[in-house]
Curated annotation (Swiss-Prot):
Binding site for S-adenosyl-L-methionine: 82, 108, 131, 164, 184
Localization terms from the record: Nucleus
Its biological purpose: RNA N6-methyltransferase that methylates adenosine residues at the N(6) position of a subset of RNAs and is involved in S-adenosyl-L-methionine homeostasis by regulating splicing of S-adenosylmethionine synthase transcripts (sams-3, sams-4 and sams-5). Able to N6-methylate a subset of mRNAs containing the 5'UACAGAAAC-3' nonamer sequence.
Record carries keyword S-adenosyl-L-methionine: yes
Outcome of substituting residue 421 to A: Reduces binding to dlc-1. Abolishes binding to dlc-1, and reduces nuclear accumulation of mett-10. Blocks nuclear entry, and results in cytoplasmic localization of the mutant mett-10 protein
EC number: 2.1.1.346, 2.1.1.348
InterPro entries on file: METTL16/PsiM, METTL16/RlmF, SAM-dependent_MTases_sf
UniProt xrefs under Gene3D superfamilies: Vaccinia Virus protein VP39
UniProt protein name: U6 small nuclear RNA (adenine-(43)-N(6))-methyltransferase
Family statement: Belongs to the methyltransferase superfamily. METTL16/RlmF family.
Subunit structure: Self-associates. Interacts with dlc-1; the interaction is direct, and is required for nuclear localization of mett-10.
One cellular-component annotation, GO: nucleus
Tissues where the protein occurs: Expressed in the intestine, vulva, and cells of the somatic gonad including distal tip cells, gonadal sheath cells and spermatheca.
Length: 479
C-alpha cells in the first residue's frame, strides 16, 4: 500500500506524484520506458534497472535542475525518499537555529552523490561527501562538477578498511564544526542478504539484483541493482552505525547532530540501547520515513547541550476548493499578515498581533463605532463602572496607529442584576520600540486535480495561536 500521504509535509511528491505522461512528452529518453494504454494513461516499467535509473535522473533534472550520471550496476536512489531525509534534517536545523553556514558530512555518498547535491541545491548547505569505493568517488566528483557545485561539495575517498568513519574526515580540518552528518549504510551483513538479492550473472562486474531468488518471495515491484559494497558490510547496518557512534563519542559536539538512515526496523533497538548507555550525555530521536511502498527510519542523536531533538510538531493541513492559494493570501492580507517567499516550496506568513479571534466582538465594536453619536450614546448608557488606564505617549496604537482606545461595551446576561463589560484598549510602546511578529508560520500549497491541500507549520510563536488561525482560515476558505 502506498504511504505517500505520510511523507514529510514539505515533500512535493506527497500530494503530487510524478506525472509520467507529462515526463514522457518532455523527455524522449524517459518515453522509451513508457507505454500508452487504452484509457489514455501511461504505464512505466519499474522492473527494468535502466528504467528506474532514467526515472531518477529525469526527476532530478526536472525538479532540482540536477544532471546526474548513475552507472549501470550501481544503486539507484529514490528521489522522494532522499528528499524526505534531507527535509527531516532541515527541520532539526531550523528548530535549533542552525541555519547559517551549514556544513554537513555525507557518509557513503555513492555515485549519485544525491544527498549532497539536493542539500546544496535546495537548502544551500555545504558538504564533505565520502566514499570508500574509488569508482563511486570519481563519478560523484564528476556529478558535482557538471552541476556547478564544486564550491559547495568536496568529494573525498576514504579507506574502507579503517574502522573509524568520521574521525579522519573531521580531523582533516581541525577548526571546523559540522552541523550534521548523514548516512545510508549498507543494510545487509555479508551472507545474510541472499534471500533478497542474488548475483547478476549477466553483468561483467560484481553486481547484485533483487530479482526473485526464492520461490517463497513474490516478484519485487521495482528493480534494484547494486554493487556488493552498496549492499553488504561486515556485521550489517547495526555494526556500521555502531562505528559512527564510536566516533561520535570522541568527537562529541564537533558535529552537532548525528543522523543515519535505518533500513530494517529490527536494527533500531540495539542501536537505541547502545546510545542510552551514555545516559544524560546524549539525546536520541527516531523518525519514520514513509514513501511509496517503502518505510525507512532516521536515527538521530547529539551530545550538544544546546541542541534539542524533541519531536518536531507536524504541520497542520486541510483541503479546500481551488484556488486555495489565492483565497488564502487574500484572507491573510485582511488579517494584516505579511507574506514572503521562503523558497521554491514554501511561503512564510508573519503576524504582529492576533486579529483572528473574538470576531463577533470585533464586528459589534465596529458596528457601534459606525452608528450615529446619538444612538451610540443611548447604547453605551448603563449603570456600570468601567475604568480604562491609558498609556503614556502619543495616543497611537502601537500596531495599527488607530488610537489607543477602541471600544467599551456592556452586554446583558441571564442575570438581570449583572452585566458583562468588555473594554479594548491599546497602549503605545515606550521609546519607539518596534515589536517583532508574535507568530511566524510556514505555508505550503499542494495542488490536486480538483482541490488544494494547504499545510501550516509553526516557525515561532504560540501553538494555540497557530491552531486558532488555521481553524479561522479553514472556516472561511472551505465553506
Amino acid at each position: 500500500m502506498s504511504q505517500n500521504n505520510e511523507m514529510h509535509p514539505r515533500n512535493p511528491y506527497r500530494n503530487k506524484p510524478p506525472d509520467f505522461k507529462a515526463l514522457a512528452v518532455e523527455y524522449p529518453e524517459f518515453r522509451k520506458f513508457c507505454q500508452y494504454v487504452s484509457n489514455g494513461k501511461v504505464t512505466f516499467d519499474f522492473k527494468k534497472d535502466a528504467a528506474v535509473r532514467c526515472l531518477t535522473q529525469t526527476l532530478l533534472k526536472k525538479d532540482f535542475n540536477l544532471d546526474v550520471e548513475i552507472p549501470p550496476g550501481h544503486l539507484v536512489p529514490r528521489v522522494p525518499q532522499k528528499l524526505n531525509y534531507c527535509l527531516l534534517i532541515d527541520d532539526l536545523l531550523k528548530a535549533n537555529k542552525l541555519t547559517k553556514n551549514v556544513i554537513g558530512i555525507d557518509i557513503g555518498t555513492g555515485t549519485s552523490c544525491i544527498h549532497a547535491l539536493i542539500g546544496a541545491r535546495q537548502f544551500n548547505w555545504k558538504f564533505i561527501a565520502t566514499d570508500g569505493d574509488e569508482k563511486s568517488v570519481r563519478v560523484a566528483h564528476e556529478n558535482v562538477a557538471k552541476n556547478g557545485l564544486s564550491s559547495s561539495i568536496c568529494v573525498v575517498h576514504v579507506n574502507p578498511d579503517v574502522k573509524t568513519v568520521l574521525m579522519d574526515v573531521v580531523n582533516t580540518i581541525p577548526d571546523t564544526d559540522y552541523a550534521f552528518c548523514m548516512c545510508n549504510p549498507p543494510f545487509f551483513e555479508k551472507g545474510n542478504g541472499d534471500d533478497k538479492f542474488c548475483e547478476d550473472i549477466s553483468s561483467s562486474t560484481e553486481t547484485y539484483s533483487n530479482r526473485v531468488a526464492s520461490e517463497f518471495r513474490t516478484a519485487p515491484h521495482s528493480a534494484t541493482f547494486a554493487s556488493s559494497a552498496e549492499l553488504f558490510v561486515d556485521g550489517g547496518e547495526v555494526a556500521f552505525v555502531n562505528r559512527i557512534i564510536d566516533d561520535s563519542v570522541l568527537l562529541r559536539d564537533r558535529i552537532k547532530i548525528y543522523t543515519t538512515m535505518i533500513g530494517r526496523k529490527s536494527s533500531l533497538k540495539p542501536l537505541q540501547n547502545r546510545l542510552q548507555r551514555f545516559g544524560d550525555d546524549v539525546k536520541i530521536m527516531i523518525s519514520v520515513l514513509n514513501q511509496g511502498k517503502t518505510k525507512r527510519w532516521m536515527l538521530a542523536w547529539t551530545f550538544s547541550k544546546s541542541v534539542s531533538l524533541t519531536t518536531i510538531d507536524r504541520p497542520i493541513s486541510f483541503q479546500c476548493p481551488k484556488p486555495g492559494l489565492t483565497r488564502l493570501m487574500q484572507e491573510i492580507s485582511i488579517l494584516n499578515g505579511r507574506l514572503r517567499q521562503e523558497d521554491t516550496l514554501a511561503i512564510v506568513a508573519e503576524f504582529k498581533c492576533v486579529t483572528w479571534t473574538n470576531q463577533r466582538a470585533r464586528k459589534r465594536a465596529k458596528a457601534i463605532l459606525s452608528e450615529s453619536s446619538i444612538k451610540k450614546a443611548k447604547w453605551n448608557f448603563s449603570n456600570v463602572a468601567c475604568q480604562v488606564a491609558f498609556g503614556a505617549g502619543d495616543g497611537k496604537d502601537s500596531y495599527t496607529d488607530a488610537g489607543n482606545f477602541v471600544s467599551s461595551e456592556s452586554i446583558p446576561t441571564n442575570n438581570l442584576n449583572a452585566w458583562d463589560n468588555a473594554s479594548q484598549a491599546y497602549f503605545p510602546l515606550p521609546n519607539g520600540e518596534v515589536p517583532g511578529p508574535i507568530i511566524r508560520i510556514r505555508i505550503q500549497v499542494f495542488s490536486e486535480d480538483s482541490y488544494d491541500s494547504i499545510s501550516f507549520e509553526l516557525i515561532s510563536g504560540s501553538k494555540q495561536h497557530l491552531h486558532q488561525l488555521v481553524q479561522y482560515l479553514k472556516n472561511l476558505i472551505c465553506r
